[in-house]
Regions:
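N-terminal leader segment of winged-helix/HTH proteins
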Residues: 1-23, 78-79
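Short, cationic-aromatic polyanion-contact patches
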Residues: 18-28, 43, 76-98
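Amphipathic alpha-helical dimerization/coiled-coil segments
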Residues: 92-125
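N-terminal helix-turn-helix DNA-binding core of bacterial DNA-binding proteins
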Residues: 19-53
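Short, hydrophobic-biased segments on the C-terminal half of alpha helices
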Residues: 62-63
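Glycine-centered, phosphate/nucleic-acid-interacting loop/turn motifs that mediate DNA/RNA or nucleotide
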Residues: 69
Length: 125
């Protein structure tokens, strides 16, 4: 039997993921971003074990990262038959991902303030 070690999320990582969630990021996406920010690369199986997410949750969350071009994906052939293993790594530095959410929230805030200003104008007009 082979033995391997997998990095797991600690309390600080979970706090980071929760902070992402407070910005409106889906739970599994936040956990996936946090996990990948802490490793050079990881297989789907490593991510499942280290983040405590199930395979379908990893796949769905990975789609969101792929849609934003934040993750690279490569297939690694294992010896023998069967499907190749997928290995993922963050393509975009974590500070740029944070900047994306910062800009998104600033834009939302500006739109909200615009609506409030319009309400003020309508009520006084």
């Amino acid at each position: 039997m082979k033995e391997s070690t997998v990095k797991v999320l600690d309390d600080k990582d979970l706090e980071f993921a929760e902070t992402l969630r407070s910005l409106g990021v889906q739970r599994n996406v936040a956990i996936l971003i946090t996990y990948l920010a802490n490793v050079d690369e990881a297989s789907s199986r490593d991510i499942e074990m280290g983040s405590n997410l199930r395979q379908p949750e990893v796949s769905i969350a990975m789609r969101a990262l792929r849609d934003n071009d934040w993750v690279s994906e490569k297939e690694v052939r294992r010896g023998g038959k069967g499907r190749p293993m997928k290995v993922y790594s963050l393509l975009t530095p974590i500070d740029e991902i944070i900047k994306h959410f910062e800009e998104e929230k600033q834009q939302e805030s500006a739109q909200t303030m615009e609506s409030i200003q319009k309400l003020k104008e309508l009520i006084s007009g």
